[in-house]
Amino acid sequence: MNIKRLAASGVMLAMLLTGAVMAHGETADFGNPADFKTGMEENFYVQEGSFQELDTIKMASQGKLMSCFGNNAGSVYTVFFLPPAPEQDYAIGNPQRGWADEAPTAIDDPEIENYPANPFFSPAGWQYKLRQDEALVLFTGLPPQCKYYSFINYILFTQEKELKDYTGEKAYFRVGNQDIGLYHPVFGSIGSSIHAGNVKSTDGSPYGSQAVIVISANQTVTDTVLAQLKASGFSEDVINVMTIPAETYRMGLEKGKDTFAFLGRISQPESQEDYDAYIANLKETSTVYRVTPKEEVADALYENETLIPRGTGVHEAASLPRVEGHLDEMRKAIIAQYADEYDYEELTGDIAVPEGLTAYTKDINSLGDNRDTSYLMTRDFTLNSDEDFIVVYGVNHTATGKAQYSNAVLYSRPMLNGICSVYDSLFTGSAEDYLPEDCAEADSYYVYKMARTQMDDYTGVIEYSTGNEKGKFYGADNGATLLMAFRAYMDETGVGPSYYEIVYDRTIVFHKK
């Protein structure tokens, strides 16, 4: 870390870096990452990476990202950027496309033959191979008050299976080459997330405090890291351990081994100013180390984590008298309002993606799944004129207690870029005109439009791609292939609701006659 630069950035940044954060009048028990690094270097190579925002729409618009992976429009994503492992080649970019090379490892003995590079995927460095005896250690401030945040590990790319035809697979593309291996995306979650409900941090608050996250597939290495953290002044109650089951995944640096990634999510901050400052300063106020033993450590494997099961045993419909009757009344009222001037098509949602380990064993793309939410998705459709529009409607999952927050997002193919999003915080009052006046549960439902222009107070505006000053993937033009997706984040179990305990959201696409 550049201490001079931090000092110039202000006292708060320096406090965040050194751990001198005050909690209820006391100094938080948080050591100095540099002391940890020094203590580990006797028996380990310690390389520093960075932890920072990955703006999927912006980077895709700049030609630096091949897919937006179904980004949750309105949320921010943060990732590790790591150097290759010791004695591993760096991935070569493509200058003609503006894709920079991966930064090389700092440990490269010319007398030792290197392991092959990671398959190149722009921006270089946010996906990486891992030896079974390596650890990643993150020292970071936690997001300010918000509706939701989490940190999750992922298997990002896996080697293509010999003689298998992937051309018909959804969201398939290829990276790599014959020398380092041919890969395709799985982007499947590994285990549980760390989130505001379970994080261990400096002052007991999940917001604005500090935490350490240790990622490892080897119990012996984890124990060594934990011992050094404690020796460096970090108390046990700020340390979070995330494990990777090395026998499940293809760990190692050799050709064809899996690549991994670490993803943070933040949604709906309470203070936009605090959030903007957090993201702008995250790279400077956080530290991430890649820790590699100088002598290989024998396997000390973790088993697959026992996950919290989805579901409470109570269906959402149980809290809503006449739920199907109310939904039918809403449907009829919506169609009656527009049917004279518009043709329409009704779309149902289905489970969009499998959970991570299921995707890995099926050898398909899970698009960065997260067990903290449910994912529903419609079939594809188009908007053919400026007068065409979309109506989404259904049960407000937050009002029924099945979600901490919920939203509907419009996506464009093939990039799966989220271009318009509406959140449950906007739903209050939106269904009143479509239900009988005596309906006491009107705010347990919602009706919202997505259109080219503001049709009423309950409309999200769909931007165009062509001529969009922010970038071409911030919108979609008429005729583009679109789909709707719906999320419901976290019920009382601490994970996403069961797909068999929620009322599925509905979509009507109206086309001008």
Regions found by a protein language model. Name each.
Residues 25-513:
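A compositional/structural signature for long, glycine/proline-rich flexible linkers
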Residues 1-10:
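Bacterial N-terminal signal peptides that target proteins for export
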Residues 10-18:
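Secretory targeting and sorting signals
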